[in-house]
Amino acid sequence: MGKRRRGKQEIDNLTKKQKKHLKEFGEQHPFHDKVVERPEKTQILRLPDSPQRPEPDSEDDSDAEQPSAYQKLLSTMIQGDEDDVESEDEESEEEDNEEEAEVEGDSEEEVEDTDEEDGNDAEEVLEDKVEETSDKLQKKHPEKTNGDVEENEEAEMEGEFTDKKNEAAFCLETNMPAEGEENTAQQEQDEDMFVKHQEIELSEEEVGRISQGSKVKTQVKWAKLGVLQCMCPLERFPAIGQASSAPLPPIHKTLEANWHLLNLPFGAATDVTELQKEMLGLMGTYRDLYLANLSPLKEAKEVRSAYCLHALNHVLKANSRVLRNNAKLKESKNGDEDFRDQGLTRPKVLILVPFRDGALRVVQTFMTLLEPKGKKTDASNKKRFKEEYGEETDEKPPNLQRPDDYHAVFSGNIDDHFRIGMSILRHSMRLYAPFYSSDIIIASPLGLRTVLGAEGEKKRDHDFLSSIELLIVDQADVFLMQNWEHLLHVLEHLNLQPLDSHGVDFSRVRMWNLNNWAAYYRQTLVFSAIQEPQITNILTKHCHNYRGQVCSKTIPKIGSICQVLVQLPHVFQMFHSDSFMDQDARFQFFVDKILPQYRDSVMSHTFIYVPSYFDFVRLRNYLKKEDVSFANISEYSQRSEVSRARHYFQKGEKQFLLFSERFHFYKRYTIKGIHNLIFYGLPTYPHFYSEVCNMLQAGVREGGASVSFTCTALYSRYDVHRLAAITGADRAAQMLQSKKTTHLFITGEEKST
């Protein structure tokens, strides 16, 4: 214990300057070195009156000193990035204090560890500190351990771990096909849509027609996918027919053994389902696809497995073609053969998922599909990946009572800031590959946004998205609940002309990539739990596939209003609006027609549900201005603010409670004390309507049975999808076509009328 206290005391006695130096360089400045009494090894030299003794605040003389072994070690890690070190020296006083606290805490732990093992002096404490500092530097700047990788490539993953060891093993330019793999070219027959799609040549006239957005629309009905709307921009690529006319695409030889085990990762039946067969048939045509109304409890897992197979099949075919052409070029004597089989950058597939758990499940599906017979998939950095993307056992409180769909969406690790690159070669997978060496990038919109940056920023990079051939947007509805602008920002940076060549061999680049036509060849797959105009707008504005688009148009016949259990009159009031984005009309209708009815003190306990946060802020400011008694709860409210608002509203001390939809999405609290319910806008998720209405049961259970409840919902003709999901397709059609602007439904003991 004495040695431990002595080591801790030495750290505590350091000045702030000394601690900062220890933090940055892993050892004390030579002036402050304390030599341990070891007469046989160390000579003690004291110079108390030396006129050349350096001042503690002076760093000029340190450069003249001969660098120690520790400094030489660190210099190899931070070589080429002196600017970053200098910028750290210019940090503010607050950051210095934070570093000081961090050094103290970390050093105390290191002292205890070294004393328990074999620490006899303060030098071992400093040695451990050097190793700790080196690890931190390597994690913060992994690119500095390999000077062969270009700076732009490293900037994308700054502050994150990237795999540098397996660069040569997964390099497409230097690898050759394995034995027996040369004959796999027979798979690439003219009937393979992958080959057709890659080799189609468009004319400038056809590109112009696609850009204009004119499309021929038709409808078909499939057994599982329901009603599908097909939009074709070019006549020579007609619309799809019935499900039987879209057979399963050819599967790459690497996947032949396991592709039928598509549903094995989530413990379902091993056979491919009918839904997956229809999806694979559609995706194999390389048309854009938008499927909505996919329940996270039922179809979500099947959908994930299907698009993982399609993405992996696409990457393996593309890489196999490159490897075969490498062998042909090597055998060619004159070298006159021309093989255009690549894009301007290597990444081919971009998969956007909202949470880390989604990325984990995608990678697990990839591993299952790539697994050779009798062996496990060779995946580098698998342990690190499971640690960073897996769920910690103590993250969620026990006995959390939430709906089943909530647990399905928020299962596992729900961190929404991540990005990871993957390289695929035969049965092997390289996790944490640098983006410019990756075949597949799995990320959240927020994770990519921090790399892409914004206009005018110094550190930004989007070249790795220049040659994306397959874009997959899974759980698009969840992105609406996060930040939709991040997703749009990513879409705006797809298939742009790169600013740097990144070492590409232009003789191998496809002509449509050189012509900046990659956007017309990119396939986009969008999957969502709801029908929403903002999601549909993705395909309208950001997708220009020359093969056209297929969108699901199935509307539920039975609405979520049938799931309301409490006896409640539902009044739907329609207001006139000129466009989907016209929020002024909704606000004026609410202020002029709805709110005055509830200003009377008799109409207390009024709950206002607001889907849009912008509308939430607008209403909050208006209620403050009008001096209305209200409380508010949003996704940005602190826990104490939420508790006070719920208490004041339940006790009647606040007449109104302003409630944002995103808070309900992330928390699913039951609000007690609701007597009057106002939907400022129809909920984004139809089951939210019934969930909020059933909150009135909480008041009934606590003795409020004698209270008469009311419910009012506002809608316009642009809310057709939300209205149909709540009231049902037939009733929604009648309401929109009727000359009346008010419609009444009764739920509870009586049937809805």
From Swiss-Prot:
Primary location recorded for the protein, binned into one broad class: nucleus
Positions of the region Disordered? 1-160, 377-402
Query: Where does it reside?
Result: Nucleus, Nucleolus
Q: Name one GO biological process term.
A: protein destabilization
Q: Where is the composition biased (Acidic residues)?
A: 80-126, 148-160
| Biased segments, Basic and acidic residues type | 23-43, 127-137, 377-388
- Protein name in the entry: U3 small nucleolar RNA-associated protein 25 homolog
The UniProt entry's GO CC annotations, sorted and at most eight, read: nucleolus; nucleus; small-subunit processome
Effect of mutating S92A: Decreases nucleolar localzsation of CAPN3, p53/TP53 degradation, cell cycle progression and liver development
Q: In which tissues is it expressed?
A: Mainly expressed in digestive organs at the later stage of organogenesis. Expressed in liver, gut and exocrine pancreas, but not in the islets.
- UniProt modification remark: Phosphorylated. Phosphorylation is required to facilitate the nucleolar localzsation of CAPN3 and promote p53/TP53 degradation in the nucleolus which promotes cell cycle progression and liver development.
